Swiss-Prot record:
The keyword Isomerase applies. PANTHER family: GLUCOSE-6-PHOSPHATE ISOMERASE. Belongs to the GPI family. Transmembrane segments: none annotated. It comes from Vibrio vulnificus (strain YJ016). The lineage of its organism: Bacteria, Pseudomonadati, Pseudomonadota, Gammaproteobacteria, Vibrionales. One of its GO terms (molecular function) is carbohydrate derivative binding. This is Glucose-6-phosphate isomerase. It is found in: Cytoplasm. The active site is at E356 (proton donor), H387, K515. Keywords: Cytoplasm, Gluconeogenesis, Glycolysis, Isomerase. It is an enzyme of class 5 (isomerase). Catalyzes the reversible isomerization of glucose-6-phosphate to fructose-6-phosphate. Its EC number is 5.3.1.9.
Length: 550
């Protein structure tokens, strides 16, 4: 079990609090000027394909010393061991947390309640391989004998965000199959998707562990009705629908052959499920071998995380730096900024991964915390963000630590596009770190022919304070393996922060209340009778909705 240590009661936290008093005066220009080896000291390589530069952070060796001491005092190493050994660290649900077993390419036994889960994991992988080979190869036929051309994944949350993010990020590896993702219960999402596909050549993947998720099953029934409007015979459903689920009776009742049901387990959290059968859409999009490469990449990062001392452990370093900003500098958000258009959903994926995991105000003792926990995560691809929100990062009043991610090698080396992209990648972190002082601004204005009065009027608005912290994550190329590295790196960063904050990162009770109330309200929307059972605001909104519809 995880320890229940209040981080603010540790010696390291007190030391960090004292250190922060002097650290507020840190200036990145001075830190780099004083230490020619700063980049070498504050960067790390993962294998031969990833470089993580954290030198442009408001830290020095003393900062890191206290942060590593905090990790040790909160018994992080024991927590890592507990997770990987299958202990039920998701204590509020009584479950192990073993998404790492899904990508355990070593096949070393992983025990849950004394039973090795690896044979079951490998059996599902073999089933996925056979299925994807048949569909991709054209052997799997629809009800009219035609090969499948389109895959529609119907899921929500972890059953959608992860597969969608990965299939987009790995688009250069795609085969001939067209992938579509439907998540929102808004009928527009399924209706617009169905306009693009042919019932004779479409395969639907229904991704719901329980096969009861409201949004997913509503969309699934709409898809089935649409399909049967053309196909007619209920028996044809089996050729066009597969299930990613554990509820065999419900799957069978829907009309899906349970031979085409791919199971996963309660020790797989939704936001960590792309490594499981939920990743079937990924395997169909890029081929099973590339899906295995994705697993291999994550497994490599798992090995690094488990076996590397804290001081050289990349997810640990990133997590601790995040805590430094979140809990001492008062930063409320972090931006993830991939300079790769294929990775346009990466920030959204980790928005769920981080905020659903660590958006908690109750500690592992069941008490309200007295300190900040999970940050707000957001971001967009560069260079788009530069023309949207970077203004606030550069010159706003909020401290927003940023992760910049970019590949050295583009999948689309058109003209000088990639050099221009990368020049922006390098320039932004330099500008954020070092800014532009008033003397430089004034000199530039004078050189541009401005008179003294104009210089005095304009100069204040063109000053950049700098000291905006960033991490730069440079990847040789985005491949299935390096993408697996990156995803696992961020997963483990989130875990480390949750351990230190003394919260449970693998439940998500915060999504339940809204669901319960929606189920109560749904029957109230069935007719035009006036509602008075809620607060005045909710009553007013429901009654206005009914009036608008009338």
């Amino acid at each position: 079990m995880l320890k229940t240590i209040n981080p603010t009661q540790t010696q390291a936290w007190n030391a960090l609090t004292a250190h922060f008093e002097s650290a507020q005066d840190m200036d990145l220009k001075d830190l780099f000027a004083q230490d020619a080896a700063r980049f070498d000291k504050f960067s790390a390589r993962f294998g031969s394909d990833i470089l993580v530069d954290y030198s442009k952070n408001l830290i020095n060796e003393e900062t890191l010393k206290h942060l590593f001491a905090l990790a040790k005092e909160t018994e992080l190493s024991a927590a890592i061991k507990a997770m990987f050994s299958g202990e039920a660290i998701n204590q509020t649900e009584g479950r192990a947390v073993l998404h790492t077993a899904l990508r355990n390419r070593s096949n070393q036994p992983v025990l849950v309640d004394g039973e090795d889960v690896m044979p079951a994991v490998n059996a599902v992988l073999e089933k996925m391989k056979s299925f994807t080979d048949r569909v991709i190869g054209g052997e799997w036929k629809g009800y009219t004998g035609k090969a499948i051309t389109d895959i529609v994944n119907i899921g929500i949350g972890g059953s959608d965000l992860g597969p969608y993010m990965v299939t987009e990020a790995l688009a250069p590896y795609k085969n001939h199959l067209n992938l579509h993702f439907v998540s929102n219960v808004d009928g527009t999402h399924i209706v617009e998707t169905l306009k693009k596909v042919d019932p004779e050549t479409t395969l639907f993947l229904i991704a719901s562990k329980t096969f009861t998720t409201q949004e997913t099953m509503t969309n699934a029934h709409t898809a089935r009705d649409w399909f049967l409007a053309t196909a007619g015979d209920q028996a044809h459903v089996a050729k066009h629908f597969a299930a990613l689920s554990t509820n065999a009776p419900a799957v069978s009742e829907f009309g899906i052959d349970t031979d085409n049901m791919f199971e996963f387990w309660d020790w797989v959290g939704g936001r960590y499920s792309l490594w499981s059968a939920i990743g079937l859409s990924i395997a169909l999009a890029v081929g099973y071998d590339n899906f295995v490469e994705l697993l291999e990449g994550a497994h490599e990062m798992d090995n690094h995380f488990v076996s590397t001392e804290l001081e050289s452990n990349i997810p640990v370093i990133l997590a601790l730096i995040g805590i430094w900003y979140n809990n001492f500098h008062g930063a409320e958000s972090e931006a993830i900024l991939p300079y790769d258009q294929y990775m346009h959903r990466f920030a959204a994926y980790f928005q769920q991964g981080n905020m659903e995991s660590n958006g908690k105000y109750v500690d592992r003792n069941g008490n309200p915390v007295t300190y900040q926990t999970g940050p707000i995560i957001w971001g967009e691809p560069g260079t788009n963000g530069q023309h949207a929100f970077y203004q606030l990062i550069h010159q706003g009043t909020k401290l927003i630590p940023c992760d910049f991610i970019a590949p050295a090698v583009s999948h689309n080396p058109a003209g000088d596009h990639h050099q221009k992209l990368m020049s922006n990648f390098f320039a932004q972190t330099e500008a954020l770190a070092f800014g532009k002082n008033e003397a430089t601004v004034k000199a530039e204005l004078v050189k541009a022919g401005k008179n003294a009065e104009e210089v005095a009027a304009i100069a204040p608005f063109k000053v950049f304070e700098g000291n905006r912290p960033t991490n730069s994550i440079l990847v040789k190329q985005i491949t299935p393996r390096t993408l697996g590295n990156l995803i696992a790196m961020y997963e483990h960063k989130i875990f480390v922060q949750g351990v230190i904050w003394n919260i449970f990162s693998f439940d998500q009770w915060g999504v339940e209340l809204g669901k319960q109330l929606a189920n109560q309200i749904l029957p109230e929307l069935a007719d035009d009778s006036e509602i008075s059972s809620h607060d005045s605001s909710t009553n007013g909104l429901i009654n206005a909705f009914k009036a608008f519809k009338a």
